[in-house]
Design a protein with these regions (language model features):
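Thiotemplate assembly-line natural product biosynthesis machinery
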Residues: 1-22, 73-87
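Glycine-rich loop motifs involved in handling phospho/adenylate chemistry
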Residues: 25-36, 59-67
Length: 87
C-alpha cells in the first residue's frame, strides 16, 4: 500500500472525529492539542482495524503518533513486516 493512501485514510479518520482547521500531514498533533491520550487510543484502534495490523506497546509512542506522517510510516512498516492484511 502506498504511503500517500495511508496518510489520506488517517487524515479522513481524524477529520471525521474532530474539526480540522489547518491540519496537515506534518502538524504536531500533541503539541497543537489536536489529540489527547484518550483520542490517541481511538487512533490506535482505528489503525489496527483499518490496516489489519497489530501494534505492540513499543509501537505506541508519542514519536510514532506525533504527526500523520509518523503514523503512516509506522503503518507502512507494520504492513511491510507482514503484520497486516495487505502485507
Amino acid at each position: 500500500m502506498e504511503q500517500q493512501e495511508i496518510k489520506e485514510r488517517i487524515y479522513q479518520f481524524l477529520t471525521k472525529l474532530k474539526k480540522a482547521d489547518g491540519l496537515e500531514y506534518d502538524t504536531e498533533l500533541f503539541k497543537s492539542k489536536y489529540i489527547t491520550s484518550l483520542f490517541a487510543l481511538q487512533i490506535v484502534m482505528f489503525l489496527e482495524k483499518e490496516f489489519g495490523i497489530k501494534l505492540g506497546r513499543k509501537d505506541i509512542t508519542e514519536q510514532n503518533f506525533h504527526t500523520i506522517n509518523a503514523m503512516a510510516e509506522l503503518v507502512q512498516l507494520r504492513l511491510g513486516a507482514g503484520g497486516g492484511k495487505n502485507g
